[in-house]
Amino acid sequence: MSEALKILNNIRTLRAQARECTLETLEEMLEKLEVVVNERREEESAAAAEVEERTRKLQQYREMLIADGIDPNELLNSMAAAKSGTKAKRAARPAKYSYVDENGETKTWTGQGRTPAVIKKAMEEQGKQLEDFLIKE
């Protein structure tokens, strides 16, 4: 709250300030204050009327949905599911190649991404082909 509003809100300070003004000035200030208060009341009532109208419309639409056999919660849930925007996770690709790493563990590779170092080394140094690592079904 600003200093001017604090002065207007405090009756003692207001009386002290009013002693320095003429009666005509005080009446003019009162008229202006009444105009401002009336404008504010009109704004508040207009805002309340808008909220009431919106609530009435929402209730009307809700009744229309129920009349058509649609549960409003079902509609909200379907809208939320469509709006979520999260992508569905892809299914993991099946392993296509199998190899034994330096620790003696059998590992698999889908064929996507970088070629594992063990397979790359075997292809370069031992002359193996990628088909040599295929998992036979």
UniProtKB/Swiss-Prot annotation:
SUPFAM superfamilies: H-NS histone-like proteins (SSF81273)
Feature type site, description Interacts with Hha: 12
CC terms in the record's Gene Ontology section: cytosol; nucleoid; protein-DNA complex
Disruption outcome: Loss of osmotic regulation of the proU locus, loss of changes in plasmid linking number. 2X decreased growth rate, which is partially restored by a mutation preventing expression of SPI2, increased expression of about half of the genes to which H-NS binds. Note strain LT2 has point mutation in rpoS which decreases its translation efficiency, in the presence of wild-type rpoS, deletion of hns is lethal. Leads to the expression of genes encoding virulence proteins in normally non-inducing conditions.
Record's subunit section: Forms oligomers of increasing size with increasing protein concentration. The fragment of 1-83 probably forms oligomers of 4 dimeric units at 10 degrees Celsius, at 40 degrees Celsius only dimers are formed. Binds Hha and YdgT (also known as cnu); crystal structures suggest each H-NS dimer could bind 2 Hha monomers on opposites sides. Probably also binds StpA.
NCBIfam families: PRK10947.1
Name by which UniProt lists this protein: DNA-binding protein H-NS
Taxonomic source organism: Salmonella typhimurium (strain LT2 / SGSC1412 / ATCC 700720)
Taxonomic lineage from the root: Bacteria, Pseudomonadati, Pseudomonadota, Gammaproteobacteria, Enterobacterales
Gene assigned in the entry: hns
